[in-house]
Amino acid sequence: MASPAPTVAADHEALLASDDPKLAANKRLVYDMYRIVLQAGLAGRAGEFIHDDYIQHNPNADQGLSGVQDYIRSTRPEREIKDTLDLPLIHLMAEGDHVMTSFVRPEKDASGDTYYSTWFDLYRIEDGKIAEHWDPMLKSDPKIDPNDKQI
């Protein structure tokens, strides 16, 4: 049974807004890291957003800032920086020092038909930079570029 794709957020700025300036800043940090590092593939700028001793819970990327940079360089080309995310963002929320994103994730079943799932990432912010990351990624070979998961 096929399920419909989750609804994508039309207004990213509304998702970035918060009455709490710290939460708004944390959401903006994660959003801009997605735009500049993950979407545009600019690994050299990762240090603007990510701690040197970054803790990574994705089994396909090594620890630390250098692990993120190596992963980005090995999975995607450099692209133009855009004002908004192309990835199908559903929601962006912050609580305390954590920011969570959710995206629509199109996949293919064994017969080649597209179905939709939801991908979640959780980030811990420390001293104005991303210090830790969790996601549901399983070991994969070859490494994937999430920019290929657009609807």
Q: What function would you assign to each model-found segment?
A:
Residues M1-G44, E48, Q150-I151:
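Short, low-complexity N-terminal intrinsically disordered segments enriched in polar/charged residues
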Residues A43-D97:
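A solvent-exposed, acidic/Ser-Thr-rich amphipathic alpha-helical stretch
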Residues L87-M93, V104, T118-Y123:
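Hydrophobic/aromatic beta-strand elements that line small-molecule binding cavities or substrate pockets
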